[in-house]
Amino acid sequence: MAKAIDKNNVWYQEVAPRSFYKEEDLERVIIQNLEIIFPHFKALPFKKKLFDSARNKSNTPDLVMIKADYSEWYIIEVELGKHDKKHVLEQIETFYNCSYTDDHASYIFNKRRRGFNLNSLKTLIATQSPKLMVIVNEPKDDWKEDLKSFRCMTCIFQIYQDFEGKALYRLNGEHPYIYTNFCHCKYEKVGYPF
């Protein structure tokens, strides 16, 4: 199991991906932290069935994420790594083939009126297909190529806990760029000959 240490010398142990939590637990943790992780986006649960008329199938995604400037949006499926790849691909194919309409914009707006402009949502959804992203709790290299055929990102969201139960989250894989006001690398000059 992986471990992490913070700047205060507190150790965190990775929560075993296949251990105690269910998909709903992972989804809840992700939705609680998504706007912190991606501060330029507004996120909310998205439990509206999406229909793929080409295959006559429907599936329901977990989350939606809208960029604050209405320049892009994401349909997100949260998955546990222990789930079958076929199950995941079937859902993503539905989201990929769905025709998004004003009805979807109204659904998002009605779920969280504060912070959204209905006309801007309608314009975004009418002019841009959503980007697709699967957020999974463990690396799934065998999913990545198949998901890419639907232009779907694979984001790994791992949960770590210290000995008091305080959480630390690790994000890896493909995801929207995270704009920060600090450098992601730190180089320290240590000893001779450096």
Name each model-derived stretch.
Residues M1-F194:
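Charged, terminal alpha-helix-loop-beta segments
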